[in-house]
Design a protein with these regions (language model features):
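Hydrophobic membrane-insertion alpha-helices, especially the h-region
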Residues: 10-30
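N-terminal hydrophobic targeting segments that direct proteins to the cell envelope
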Residues: 28-48
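Soluble "head" domains of membrane/secretory-pathway proteins
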Residues: 5-13, 35-38, 50-270
């Protein structure tokens, strides 16, 4: 009987040890290979930071900032980027496409957005007026419209997205599966909006159309060299607190933020 128990117990112990070693290796690899980030703001709601209004609670996760990942970016992936728009004070000396390193990280605005258009494509938005009118008929205030799933469904159906590939004459409608947060009173601005992207240019937008500073808001693309990384996963939530420090390299003070009180959940992969 004892011999039978040993024959059963020892293999189980070995399997548990091997499992723990594998998990430890994966965790160590992830922590060193990927870069940790936290999501600030509401521009990616309802996908990210859905609870950000609750006392500074935000999502945190991992991005892949290696060139191998950035060079293979696909449509609708979520990325982190520094913005090239001069009026947002993201660059001290403006933007120069010929320079390899155009970002002054002391001044840059660090964003997380979703990729809509890839280099050399032409993107187009079209509005279905019947769906737009259905959304408007059911809403009395912007707050109600943004919080009503029924109204938001009509809003999402109203804004349709098309892409024309390089060297093609045909626009192809894209199937958008992720949810977007849209102000029905501003849908008309998307009607027949079109933009032709050049080499190394990307079109990115936040999922929260009603509160996102992005390519549509600025009517301008971002560039390959602005991209920092591709979102791999959201690992949990944390609370962000400000950390004001004296910056000896520039005049004044520098405000940075850190992620505290981390609460992990099962990773959500993107």
């Amino acid at each position: 009987m004892k011999k039978k128990l040993k024959l059963i117990i020892w293999p189980i112990i070995y399997l548990v040890l091997i499992f723990n070693v594998c998990i430890s290796f994966i965790l160590v690899f992830r922590s060193y290979y990927y870069r940790s980030i936290f999501v600030s703001g509401s521009s990616m709601q309802p996908t990210l930071n859905l609870d950000s209004n609750k006392s500074g609670v935000v999502d945190f996760g991992l991005i892949d900032d290696h060139d191998s990942a950035i060079k293979k970016i696909k449509r609708f992936q979520i990325i982190t980027t520094y913005y090239p728009f001069p009026d947002s004070h993201d660059y001290v000396d403006g933007f120069d496409l010929e320079k390899e390193n155009v970002v002054d990280e002391r001044e840059a605005s660090y964003k997380i957005k979703r990729v809509y258009g890839l280099p050399n494509e032409t993107i187009r938005f079209v509005v279905d007026e019947d769906e737009m009118n259905a959304a408007l008929a059911k809403s009395t205030t912007v707050t109600e419209a943004l919080n009503s799933e029924e109204i938001q469904y009509h809003c999402r159906q109203a804004i349709q997205f098309y892409v024309k590939a390089p060297n093609s004459e045909v626009f192809v409608k894209q199937n958008i599966k992720f949810k977007r947060r849209i102000n029905p009173y501003k849908i008309t601005q998307y009607q027949n909006f079109e933009y032709e992207l050049g080499e190394g240019e990307y079109w990115v937008m936040g999922d929260n159309y009603s509160a996102s500073s992005d390519c549509f808001n600025k009517r301008a693309p971002i560039y390959y060299q602005n991209i920092v990384g591709v979102l791999i996963s959201i690992e949990g939530t944390c609370k962000i607190v400000s950390d004001v420090k004296i910056d000896t390299t520039v005049d004044g003070t520098k405000v940075s933020y850190k992620c505290t009180n981390k609460k992990y959940h099962f990773p959500t992969y993107y």
